[in-house]
């Protein structure tokens, strides 16, 4: 009968509507992730975290809900290469962009472009300092200033008595691969300020010498070099390579009064180790230079376990990658997101 046919047509129409809405609910999101590098085990670990979290989300959804592309420059000093990678990311019109900028100035125009397209940007690791207001929705990163302080405290526990026993001045070196990226600069400043604070508690004055950016960037109270119990010498290479960091570290390791040295990221810490290969001055003994590093690549881990390097601060790069994916997805779905500290710890 006509009624039955009509009922059937309506039922079929209803099914079609339901089917369409089921398909419509299968939202897919593509993310572009522009990292600060690709070369170190650190960035590979961030990538592992993004892959693992993406797989979990897709498995849970029962379809490929998220896809991403992860790129980074050959070296962290290669600003031009990262600019073109970020430009490609913006042009791809993704649901959101993950970004760790190698430079604080170079991306202002491109970020404004992403903003005008309403593409959320999530900072990770060093994030995107100096970005226009509202462009970066949230960051997945270690609190780098605090992490520099963690490195200083770890070192201080080992050298405090030696400083007290020293007749004259002592020198603590710091090698930073650059003076532009947020993570390294904040880490470097966090270390210096914490050493100044710990020294002041013992009644010792510190002088900060070397690279101008860090000399001017300290917030702690410093004294003239001649009056200082502790000289903090900061050196920065011309580009972000291990061998160039090694050259800077050698200068510090060759100073008579050096008792400790800090390499503020994987590249700088490996530079300290390379410098030591021809000098044999670092170790864990009271007559040796106490080296402290950052990150937990295999070279640094091996040096810590054999005692060449006293200790290092480890971040959670896999955790950064995982949190990054969560923040990218939430921002793409229009949820409110906030900065997430991914933590760090000192290990010996």
What is the predicted function of each stretch?
Residues 5-23:
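Sec-dependent N-terminal signal peptides of Gram-positive bacterial secreted proteins and lipoproteins
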Residues 23-348:
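A residue-level marker of the well-folded mature domains of exported/periplasmic proteins
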Residues 1-2:
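Short, Lys/Arg-enriched N-terminal segments with co-localized hydrophobic residues
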């Amino acid at each position: 009968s006509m009624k039955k046919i009509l009922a059937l047509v309506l039922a079929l129409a209803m099914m079609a509507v339901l089917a369409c809405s089921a398909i419509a609910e299968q939202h897919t999101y593509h993310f572009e992730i522009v990292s600060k590098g690709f070369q170190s085990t650190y960035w590979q670990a961030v990538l592992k975290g993004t892959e693992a979290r993406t797989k979990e989300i897709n498995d849970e959804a029962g379809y490929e809900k998220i896809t991403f592309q992860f790129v980074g420059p050959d070296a962290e000093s290669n600003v031009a290469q990262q600019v073109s990678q970020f430009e490609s990311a913006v042009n791809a019109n993704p649901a959101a962009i993950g970004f760790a900028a190698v430079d604080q100035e170079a991306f202002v125009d491109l970020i404004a472009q992403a903003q005008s397209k309403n593409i959320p940007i999530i900072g990770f690791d060093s994030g995107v300092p100096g970005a226009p207001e509202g462009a970066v929705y949230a960051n997945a990163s270690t609190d780098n200033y605090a992490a520099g302080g963690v490195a200083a405290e770890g070192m201080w526990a080992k050298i405090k008595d030696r400083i007290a026993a020293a007749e004259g001045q002592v020198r603590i070196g710091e090698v930073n691969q650059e003076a532009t990226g947020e993570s390294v600069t904040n880490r470097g400043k966090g270390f210096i300020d914490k050493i100044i604070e710990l020294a002041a508690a013992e009644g010792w004055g510190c002088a900060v010498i070397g690279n101008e950016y860090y000399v001017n960037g300290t917030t702690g109270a410093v004294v003239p070099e001649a009056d200082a119990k502790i000289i903090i010498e900061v050196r920065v290479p011309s580009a972000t390579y291990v061998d160039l960091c090694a050259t800077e570290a050698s200068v510090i390791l060759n100073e008579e009064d050096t008792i400790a040295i800090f390499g503020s990221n994987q590249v700088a810490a490996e530079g300290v180790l390379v410098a030591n290969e021809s000098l044999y001055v670092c170790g864990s003994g009271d007559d040796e230079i106490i080296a402290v590093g950052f990150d937990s690549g295999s070279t640094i881990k091996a040096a810590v376990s054999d005692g060449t390097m006293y200790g290092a601060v480890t971040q959670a790069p896999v955790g950064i990658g995982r949190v990054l994916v969560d923040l990218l997805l939430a921002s793409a779905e229009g949820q409110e997101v906030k900065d997430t500290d991914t933590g760090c710890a000192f290990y010996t």
